[in-house]
Structures are given as C-alpha cells and as structure tokens.
C-alpha cells in the first residue's frame, strides 16, 4: 500500500550515490592487507578500478564455487588473488574429510558438506559398452538399462531425451589406460681404448684387494701394531697408561 500511495523508488539519496561511486574511500596504507570484511569493488566488476592493490574493497575475479578452508581459519594470505571463495556460504563449503573418508562425522554442527558416497560413483564405461571384466568388484556403477532399438538400427528421433539407453562404444582414455610410449633404443656407445684400460685396471685392483697384513694394522685402543682393536687384550684405556 505504501508503494502505491507514496512510492520512493525514483528517489535516490545522496548516501546511496556515495556508496555506489565509493566517494571518500581512501587507499590502503600498503598492498596485501586483509579485506575479507570489506565490500566488493563495483568499479573492478566493470574493469574500471585504477587503485589496483591499494583499493580498500575486494577484487573478485571469476566464479568461485568452493569456500577457502584457510580463510575460515583466518590463515589465507592470498587475499583477492585466492582462487577460492572468501565468503561464508553453506552451499559452497568444501567436502568434510571425515565423512568422505570414514562415512561418518561426529561433529553435529559440522560446517562442511556431507556428500553421499553413492552420488560420487560414476557409471562404468566398460559396462555401458557391453562387458566389464571386474564384474561386481568394479568400483564404478553397473546400471542395467534397456537399449534403444532405433539407436542400434542407426538413428533415434528422440535424441538425448530418449528414455532408453544409447550405448557408447568409445572409451575414455585415462591416465592408467594410456598405451605405453615406445622406448627409444639407442646404439651402444663406443668407449675409447684409454678409458677401457683405466676401468679394467681399476676393476682388477679392486678385485685383488684383500685384507691388509697384521704388520700394517695399528690398534686404536693401545696404539700398537700387529692386531685389530677387537682382538686387543689391554683394554680401551691402555693408551692413557702407556701399558
């Protein structure tokens, strides 16, 4: 009734004009400050903001579908450059880790999304093609459908809206199903005769190396020659007494 008798839709207050044009908005002291509680910059949405990183309002670019989990804890350092949403929206919260991992969550007021595991299972492309070797152990969904006879003949007038199944004979090429790349066979490289001689001499010297004679062995416990430290009978403090 008030809109009929005295409509004020055509009246625009000075405060509304000041808010739309961001009059009196001072630039930030330094870039990179937290602007999570500020409003969205209207000029940035129109690609007309000249303040850049010093703008006191938020610069939101693109469609962000998931809330930033670090912003919820006040730990996000990316600010407007974050690829996730800095806004508390229950419909865009990330998935609950405990519910997705264990199938249950003990927090009755959990702010994260509890997604049904059945809804995340995709249809098996092999089963839709006709046969899946994994059978009931397949991690994908096996759904029985009635094949469209018209589609098998060659053409279905219903198209995608047909209530029967239109089988797809092509398979998605996953990362694990890609054919192995052919390995390049390189011819054996020929080594110089000098290098071969050095390597043979090193191998022969290493193969002929045996235990050193006891005359060259010095015991680190007593300091005498002729036996190893594990065979010393004078004790580990014999070098202090000079015995």
Curated annotation (Swiss-Prot):
* Residue ranges of coiled coil: none
A single GO cellular-component term from the record reads: mRNA cleavage and polyadenylation specificity factor complex
| One BP annotation, GO | mRNA processing
Q: Which UniProt keywords apply?
A: Metal-binding, mRNA processing, Nucleus, Phosphoprotein, Repeat, RNA-binding, Zinc, Zinc-finger
What the entry lists under Gene3D superfamilies is as follows: Zinc finger, CCCH-type (4.10.1000.10), Zinc finger, CCHC-type (4.10.60.10)
Q: Which residues carry this modification: Phosphoserine?
A: 241
The answer to whether UniProt assigns keyword Zinc to this entry is yes
Zinc finger regions, CCHC-type: 217-234
For this protein, the record's Pfam families field holds:
zf-CCCH, zf-CCCH_3, zf-CCHC
GO MF entry, a single one = sequence-specific double-stranded DNA binding
InterPro entries, per the entry: CPSF4/Yth1, Znf-CCCH_3, Znf_CCCH, Znf_CCCH_sf, Znf_CCHC, Znf_CCHC_sf
Subcellular location, principal: nucleus
So which domain of life are we looking at? Eukaryota
State the function annotated in the UniProt record: Component of the cleavage and polyadenylation specificity factor (CPSF) complex that play a key role in pre-mRNA 3'-end formation, recognizing the AAUAAA signal sequence and interacting with poly(A) polymerase and other factors to bring about cleavage and poly(A) addition. CPSF4 binds RNA polymers with a preference for poly(U).
PANTHER family reported in the protein's UniProt record: CLEAVAGE AND POLYADENYLATION SPECIFICITY FACTOR SUBUNIT 4, CLEAVAGE AND POLYADENYLATION SPECIFICITY FACTOR SUBUNIT 4-RELATED
Record-stated family: Belongs to the CPSF4/YTH1 family.
Assembly description: Component of the cleavage and polyadenylation specificity factor (CPSF) complex, composed of CPSF1, CPSF2, CPSF3, CPSF4 and FIP1L1. Interacts with FIP1L1.
Q: What is this protein called?
A: Cleavage and polyadenylation specificity factor subunit 4
Organism in which the protein naturally occurs: Rattus norvegicus
């Amino acid at each position: 009734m008030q809109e009929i008798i005295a409509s004020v839709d055509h009246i625009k207050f000075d405060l509304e004009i000041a808010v739309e044009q961001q009059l009196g908005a001072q630039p930030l002291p330094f870039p990179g400050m937290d602007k999570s509680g500020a409003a969205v910059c209207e000029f940035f949405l129109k690609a007309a903001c000249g303040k850049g990183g010093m703008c006191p309002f938020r610069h939101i670019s693109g469609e962000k579908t998931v809330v930033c989990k670090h912003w919820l804890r006040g730990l996000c350092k990316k600010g407007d450059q974050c690829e996730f949403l800095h806004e508390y929206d229950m419909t865009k919260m990330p998935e609950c880790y405990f519910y997705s991992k264990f199938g249950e969550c003990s927090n009755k007021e959990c702010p994260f999304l509890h997604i049904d595991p059945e809804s995340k299972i995709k249809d098996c492309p092999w089963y839709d093609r006709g046969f899946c070797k994994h059978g009931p152990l397949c991690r994908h969904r096996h759904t029985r459908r009635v094949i469209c006879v018209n589609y098998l003949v060659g053409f279905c007038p219903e198209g995608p809206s047909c209530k029967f199944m239109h089988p797809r004979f092509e398979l998605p090429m996953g990362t694990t199903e890609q054919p192995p790349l052919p390995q390049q066979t390189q011819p054996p490289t020929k080594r110089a005769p000098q290098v071969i001689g050095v390597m043979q001499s090193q191998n022969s010297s290493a193969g002929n190396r045996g235990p050193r004679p006891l005359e060259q062995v010095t015991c680190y416990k007593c300091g005498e020659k002729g036996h190893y430290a594990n065979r010393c009978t004078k004790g580990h403090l014999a070098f202090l007494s000079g015995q």
